[in-house]
Each structure stands twice: as structure tokens, then as C-alpha cells.
């Protein structure tokens, strides 16, 4: 059950509207929540739970695909209200349990408004692990680094529904990832999974059928397009500074000037390390 959560990020030109998806999986005994949205998202999530005829207290397990604010922001309030266990990849644990550290190391505009506070990760999960849902169903953990070092995707079997977190960039949207090579490798790994029926991404509306693989192809092409633009501009402007490079790349790939924010600067820096 997808839950679309709108929020805004401050910018010099005013608030920028964004959204993120969380997902509920209902089992007979309890509810599993994938990602917690931003601070305050618990109200929307709990409302969706009640609309399903269930109670928020039935959320027994929260799986975090990674540690960024729009995925962990509501986790503290959700855990306080439900007592749920929280699972994440070991590489994401530090920033989930120490949000002040995350703010220092990865400053995001409006961070303190987006994140309710830290939470303790009670279960560490990695590539190949399985989260049992009951009735023969399970979530297979797939390590998909790139967006962040510990990003995970989840494949629900036997339905073959893929929850990809932020592993699949959206063409025309802000390119946000820490390692372009790892992002490409993760995308290719997901693209090689056969018979995916539905794709539930945090950044885009749910997709089914052939659209699943078209979406992955498009994300793959977007990372390649950013890489092309970085290479083109660094060759044309040897010794160019990072901020100036980012502004030129943003223009080259067709994004507005305000897209050259700290998160995108971080992405472009990663591409220069690749070069």
C-alpha cells in the first residue's frame, strides 16, 4: 500500500515542493512499514493504517531503505507510538542513530524540520537477508549502493514486487547519489531481475509491467547523462571550481539554476572523483 507524503525543502527562491513514498505491507498478524517519511509523516501514515481497518499499534517492523531525512524523519514518532523494531543496513546505522552527525556530514536545507530525531536500529540487514512476512511471503534484501553506501532495495516474494528506495534516479529531477559507478552497478543488478511485476520507488509513482524496466533504463540513462555533462565541461574548462562546474552541469542537463544545491554539488563532486 503506497503512501505519498508531500513536503517542502527551503531554497533561496522559496520552498521547493517534493514528495516521497512510504509503503505498508499488511500481514495477518501485523503491519510492516517501509520508510518513515519526513517529520510529521506519522499522522498521514497512521491515517492510512486506519483506512485499512487496522491500528497504528499493529506496525511491528519498520524497514529503512537508507538514512536520509525524507526516509527516517518520522521514525522516532512512529517508534514511540508503536514500539516497532527498526531494520537498516549497517552502513546507514550511524546517521540513523546520530542525526546530528548526519546534519554535520551531509547538510541538507531544512534538515531539522525534516527529521524528528534519532532512533535505534534493532536489526541490521544486508544483501541476501530475508524478512519473513508469513503465509509464504518474504522480503529479500538487495544491497543497492550508489545513492548512499548502505542503500537497500526489497523484493517481495513470491509476488515479485520491488521496493527500490532511492536507487533509481528520475530523469529531469535532481541527481542525488554519492557514487555514480555504484549507482550504475546497482541499477544494472535490478534490471537483471526477471519477472518483476510492480516497482514501488520512493521518488516516483508506482509502475507495473514493462514500465518497470523502462523506468530503470531511464534512471540508468540519467546517471550516464550527468556523467557526460561533467566530462564535457571539465574538458572544456580545466581547473574549474566545483560550484561553477555544478552550475554549468545543471544548465547542460536542462535543470533550473536553483537545482545547484548542496546535495547536487555533492553528486557532481562524486562524478569528478570518478573522472
Regions found by a protein language model. Name each.
Residues 100, 173-178, 214:
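Short, solvent-exposed loop/turn segments at secondary-structure boundaries
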Amino acid at each position: 500500500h503506497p503512501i505519498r507524503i508531500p513536503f517542502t525543502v527551503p531554497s533561496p527562491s522559496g520552498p521547493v515542493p517534493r514528495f516521497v513514498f512510504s509503503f505498508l505491507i499488511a500481514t495477518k498478524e501485523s503491519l510492516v512499514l517501509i520508510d518513515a517519511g519526513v517529520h510529521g509523516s506519522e499522522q498521514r501514515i497512521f491515517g492510512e493504517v486506519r483506512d485499512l481497518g487496522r491500528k497504528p499499534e499493529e506496525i511491528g517492523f519498520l524497514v529503512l531503505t537508507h538514512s536520509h531525512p525524507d526516509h527516517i524523519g518520522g521514525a522516532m514518532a512512529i517508534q514511540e507510538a508503536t514500539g516497532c523494531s527498526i531494520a537498516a543496513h549497517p552502513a546507514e546505522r550511524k546517521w540513523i542513530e546520530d542525526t546530528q552527525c548526519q546534519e554535520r556530514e551531509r547538510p541538507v536545507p531544512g534538515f531539522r524540520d525534516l527529521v524528528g530525531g534519532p532512533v535505534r536500529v534493532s536489526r541490521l540487514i544486508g544483501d541476501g537477508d530475508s524478512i519473513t512476512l508469513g503465509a509464504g511471503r518474504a522480503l529479500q534484501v538487495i544491497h543497492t549502493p550508489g545513492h548512499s553506501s548502505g542503500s537497500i532495495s526489497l523484493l517481495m516474494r513470491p509476488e515479485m514486487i520491488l521496493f527500490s528506495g532511492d536507487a533509481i534516479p528520475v530523469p529531469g529531477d535532481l541527481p542525488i547519489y554519492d557514487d555514480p559507478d555504484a549507482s550504475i552497478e546497482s541499477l544494472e543488478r535490478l534490471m537483471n531481475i526477471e519477472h518483476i511485476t510492480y516497482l514501488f520507488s520512493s521518488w516516483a509513482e508506482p509502475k507495473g509491467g514493462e514500465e518497470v524496466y523502462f523506468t530503470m533504463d531511464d534512471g540508468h540513462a540519467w546517471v550516464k547523462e550527468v556523467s557526460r555533462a561533467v566530462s564535457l565541461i571539465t574538458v572544456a574548462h580545466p581547473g574549474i571550481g566545483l560550484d561553477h562546474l555544478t552550475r554549468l552541469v545543471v544548465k547542460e542537463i536542462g535543470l533550473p539554476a536553483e537545482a545547484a544545491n548542496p546535495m547536487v554539488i555533492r553528486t557532481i563532486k562524486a562524478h569528478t572523483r570518478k573522472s
